[in-house]
Design a protein with these regions (language model features):
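Conserved "landmark" site that anchors the functional core of diverse proteins
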Residues: 1-195
Length: 195
């Protein structure tokens, strides 16, 4: 079995995957909403029409991600207020940090914290760093940040405790767009230096 499931209230099922990469490929025609987590998928459904067991039986683990995942190239100005701190903690130069950050390919594992805030895996292990001891009251939209094993881009102005290494003018969240979040789970992201 590749996943286990649990009822999540009367109108949802939580799938837990032994292989977290499979969560991007989970589809269900009976689900009204699919929410991807770090190793789970939440399927919300119409409880008046379906039972938990019906929804679970309709889950398919096809190659859905391969056909829908997008690739994004994000231009970044590497001038974040925590850039030197992250380089120092990583025991590499700022130039080396930028080189490593732009050579990696990241995958959007899941979204959370704020609309359009994608947790990107693929960060060089040397650059894994703790969050700030004291969060900032306001992090500007477009801030490129790292914390723990993840990289992210703040899609809107918000409070935040991640280490800021750069900024982008790319729009990551547009509530008027058909898909408001630019980067969605399963998508890949690469960063390039603004010259």
């Amino acid at each position: 079995m590749t996943h286990t499931w649990h009822p999540y209230g009367s109108d949802a099922v939580l799938l837990e995957f032994t292989d977290p990469h499979q969560r991007w490929a989970a589809t269900c025609p009976l689900a009204d909403e699919v929410v991807v987590g770090a190793s789970t998928v939440l399927l919300r459904f119409d409880a008046r029409r379906y039972r938990h067991e019906h929804v679970v039986a309709a889950v398919s683990l096809g190659s859905h991600v391969a056909s829908t995942a997008a690739e994004h190239v994000i231009p970044v100005t590497y001038d974040g207020p925590d850039l030197a701190v992250v380089a120092d903690r990583s025991e590499i130069s700022i130039a080396e940090l930028i080189r490593r950050h732009t050579e990696a390919t990241y995958r959007a594992e899941f979204c959370g914290f704020a609309p359009g805030f994608a947790y990107l895996s693929g960060l060089d292990p040397a650059m894994h760093t703790a969050r700030r001891a004291s969060p900032r009251a306001r992090v500007p939209r477009g801030s490129v940040a790292v914390a723990g094993p993840y990289c992210a881009i703040y899609p809107t102005d918000s409070p935040g405790g991640w280490q800021l290494i750069g900024r982008t003018e790319a729009v990551l969240f547009d509530p008027a767009a058909p898909y408001p979040a630019t980067v969605r789970p399963g998508d890949t992201v690469r960063f390039e230096v603004v010259r």
